[in-house]
């Protein structure tokens, strides 16, 4: 088993450089960006109490289209309304963008689950991000404990 930091760095590094950007509803992944070398863009700032304006959404849509980003991410603790607006906006400009999966940001997974631990949360987030953005990672995650949970994202049988 790779240590989680090494697994995360190698997994994120396997994403094509031009696609190495994580787009989420709000800016809760600054730590992840710094630790593992992925750019983070969000519709909202750090707080979820204010809504982004139309101009904010349009700028992010333009970014998605210009960079040809294939996937953006919903968060377990944040409404997906802004993500849906980004997907629709990109589609109106001819860019297909999908939901790459759900990430754990301000809250870990359910208590008593692997994703409910810090290691499980990092493993889950890293595996989901890498699979959605074209990286090379085991579908079951760092040590196979995500088997069957991230399978649909991989496109593999």
PLM-predicted stretches and their roles:
Residues 1-157:
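Extracytoplasmic metal-acquisition and chelation regions
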């Amino acid at each position: 088993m790779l240590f989680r930091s090494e697994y995360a760095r190698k997994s994120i590094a396997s994403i094509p450089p031009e696609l190495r950007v994580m787009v989420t509803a709000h800016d809760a992944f600054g730590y992840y960006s710094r630790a593992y070398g992925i750019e983070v863009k969000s519709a909202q700032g750090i707080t979820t109490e204010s809504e982004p304006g139309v101009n904010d959404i349009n700028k992010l849509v333009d970014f998605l289209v210009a960079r040809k980003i294939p996937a953006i991410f919903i968060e377990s603790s944040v409404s997906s309304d802004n993500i849906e607006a980004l997907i629709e906006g990109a589609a109106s400009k001819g860019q297909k963008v999908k939901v790459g999966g759900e990430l754990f940001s301000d809250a870990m997974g359910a208590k008593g689950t692997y994703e409910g631990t810090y290691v499980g949360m990092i493993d889950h987030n890293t595996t989901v991000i890498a699979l959605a953005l074209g990286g090379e990672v085991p579908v079951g995650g760092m040590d196979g404990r995500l088997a069957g949970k991230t399978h649909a994202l991989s496109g593999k049988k």
